[in-house]
Regions:
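Short glycine-rich hinge loops at helix-strand junctions in the catalytic core
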Residues: 109, 126-127, 150
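Short coil/turn motifs at secondary-structure junctions
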Residues: 85-87, 104, 138
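Conserved acetyl-CoA pyrophosphate-binding loop and the N-cap/start of the following alpha-helix
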Residues: 105, 109-117
C-alpha cells in the first residue's frame, strides 16, 4: 500500500539507504547527503531534517521544510520536500515542493500519487493560496505529474516551467 511518512528515527535504516543513494543533483533537486555514512546520517542529516521541519536555527535564506518519504509497503520509493512558506528566492525559484522518485519506480504512476499525498500534507502547512512548483523544461514527466494534480503553467523561462496548484 502506498503511503507517505515524515522523516523519523524509527525508519532510519531505510531512510539512510535511500538518501545515501539519491543523486547529488538531479532535475533541480539537490541532495547534500548523497553517499553519507550511516553514522553521519544518524547524528547529522536526520537530526537536521527534523530541525528544519521545526524551523530551528535555520540560516537566514532558509525556510522550515518537511521531509517526506513515499513508501510502497515496506520500501521507500521516493522523497518529497515541503517548504512551509515562500521567501523571495523560493517564490521566483524552486517553490514549495521538491520531489524525487527512484529511477526503478519512474513511469509507473508513483510520482503522481506521491505528489497527491504530499499536497494533502502541504495544504495543512502552506499559508499561500496556491502551491508553487518549478520543473526543468527537459523533464516532461515531472511536468505531467504536476498537471495530473491540477497544476497549470503560469510562467516559463529558457530552463523552467513555473507551475501553480490551487490550495
Amino acid at each position: 500500500m502506498l503511503s507517505i511518512k515524515k522523516a523519523n528515527f524509527e525508519d532510519i535504516e531505510k531512510e539512510w539507504a535511500f538518501v545515501r543513494d539519491m543523486p547529488e543533483d538531479e532535475n533541480g533537486l539537490t541532495n547534500a547527503w548523497h553517499g553519507i555514512s550511516h553514522d553521519d546520517f544518524e547524528t547529522k542529516a536526520l537530526p537536521d531534517m527534523l530541525r528544519f521541519e521545526r524551523g530551528e536555527n535555520l540560516p537566514d535564506w532558509m525556510v522550515p521544510e518537511t521531509f517526506l518519504f513515499l513508501w510502497e509497503d515496506d520500501t521507500i520509493i521516493g522523497q518529497f520536500r515541503i517548504r512551509h512558506y515562500l521567501n523571495d528566492a523560493l517564490r521566483e525559484g524552486a517553490g514549495h515542493i521538491g520531489q524525487f522518485i527512484a529511477k526503478e519506480y519512474r513511469g509507473k504512476g508513483y510520482g503522481t500519487k506521491g505528489l497527491a499525498l504530499t499536497l494533502e500534507v502541504a495544504r495543512t502547512i502552506i499559508p499561500e493560496e496556491e502551491i508553487y512548483l518549478r520543473v526543468n523544461r527537459d523533464n516532461p514527466a515531472s511536468l505531467k505529474v504536476m498537471q495530473k494534480n491540477g497544476g497549470r503553467i503560469v510562467k516559463e523561462d529558457e530552463e523552467h516551467y513555473f507551475v501553480r496548484i490551487k490550495k
